[in-house]
Curated annotation (Swiss-Prot):
Predominant location: cytoplasm
Gene: leuB
Name by which UniProt lists this protein: 3-isopropylmalate dehydrogenase
Job description of the protein: Catalyzes the oxidation of 3-carboxy-2-hydroxy-4-methylpentanoate (3-isopropylmalate) to 3-carboxy-4-methyl-2-oxopentanoate. The product decarboxylates to 4-methyl-2 oxopentanoate.
GO biological process: L-leucine biosynthetic process
Catalytic activity: (2R,3S)-3-isopropylmalate + NAD(+) = 4-methyl-2-oxopentanoate + CO2 + NADH
Length: 350
């Protein structure tokens, strides 16, 4: 029996994960769904955002789905014990190096985008973000006192050939099943790591994926083009920092952060890590206002990529589209449905 580990986390996480549990029970009754504390909720109970037991439970599962993590309540906790540290440590432990962050616009929501509907209608971009390297993990890092009384903050951006190659392969393989086009975004004009990134992707393309169209683009120009003409893109592969920024920018083209899922994948046969890209939204937590669709669509990605239940994934994606076509809207989409009522709409469509 396949196992899904739910880590609801903080803020609105438990509310949106409750809807995932309802959908899983209806769509995949044979799926074993476990649940554990994580993030700030774990810190409050166990003094750490990620216990050894939960880490081992995650590694033994077929897929892990998180709700949300963090909030101002834990802002004064030591950095290594903040909820977000639990997320980084779990990613590292699972070695999920490729972050898939789709930015697609459902036809029913084209009018909710910050851009004109004709620019985003039919939008379907897949970001492939390197997830366990780069400036978020590079050493040395820190804040030092200087002799003149000032302080110096520093981080280190580091990438190796193998780290770039493995995420590049994910992007090229995905492109073969889509429109056969990859953009690689970096800053090779000013960063040595960006120069290496461009070289490695170029060599990998020539050696293993000459059938895929490859274009290199500077990350700042990529940000501009996402606003100017986003439908020129299909698969965008980039590093940890730029992937974080660019995929968030693209998310708003779709109408709401509450709509977008993500997947973090490692080696074949290893569990994937799935989560909505929205935050914990502590200002609306417990009020029934959160949009659960990003979490539900994260479950759809888990069905597709880790649990290998493609038909169930297709049915769930169609149900979400049908619910939106029928006018189901939470507050972030200009409607009035509660979190549970949006879950009801998806279940009715199923």
């Amino acid at each position: 029996m396949a196992t899904l580990l739910l880590l609801p986390g903080d803020g609105i996480g438990p509310e949106v994960c409750a809807q995932v549990r309802r959908v899983a029970a209806a769509l995949t009754p044979d799926l074993k769904v476990d649940e554990a504390l994580y993030g700030g909720a774990s810190y409050d109970t166990h003094g750490t955002p990620l216990t050894d037991e939960v880490r081992e439970q995650a590694l033994a599962s077929d897929a892990v789905l998180m709700g949300a993590v963090g909030g101002p309540k834990w802002a004064d906790a030591p950095r290594h014990l903040r909820p977000e540290a639990g997320l980084l440590n779990l990613r590292k432990a699972m070695d999920v190096f490729a972050n898939l962050r789709p930015a697609y616009c459902f036809e029913a929501l084209a009018g909710a985008s910050s851009l004109k509907p004709e620019l985003v209608s039919g939008l379907d971009i897949m970001f492939v973000r390197e997830l366990v390297g780069g400036v978020y993990f590079g050493q040395p890092r820190g804040i030092e006192d200087l002799a003149d009384g000032q302080k110096k903050g520093f981080d280190t951006q580091v990438y190796t050939t193998s780290e770039i190659e493995r995420v590049g392969r994910v992007a090229f393989e995905l492109a073969r099943g889509r429109t056969n086009k990859v953009h690689s975004a970096e800053k090779s004009n000013v960063m040595e790591s960006g120069l290496l990134w461009k070289q490695v992707i170029t060599e990998l393309h020539a050696r293993e994926y000459p059938d895929v169209q490859l274009e290199h683009i500077l990350a700042d120009n990529c940000a501009m083009q996402l606003v100017r003409a986003p439908k020129q893109f299909d698969v965008i592969v980039t590093d940890n920092l730029f992937g974080d920024i660019l995929s968030d920018a693209a998310a708003m083209l779709t109408g709401s952060l509450g709509m977008l899922p993500s997947a973090a994948l490692g080696a074949p046969g290893k569990p994937g890590l799935y989560e909505p890209i929205h935050g914990s939204a502590p200002d609306i937590a417990g009020k029934g206002l959160a949009n659960p669709l990003a979490a539900i669509l994260s479950f759809e990605m888990a069905l597709r990529w880790s649990l290998k239940q493609t038909e169930a994934a297709d049915a769930l994606l169609a149900a979400v589209k049908a619910a939106l076509d029928n006018g189901a809207r939470t507050r972030d989409l200009g409607g009035s449905l509660t979190t549970t009522q949006m879950g009801d709409a998806v279940l009715a469509a199923l």
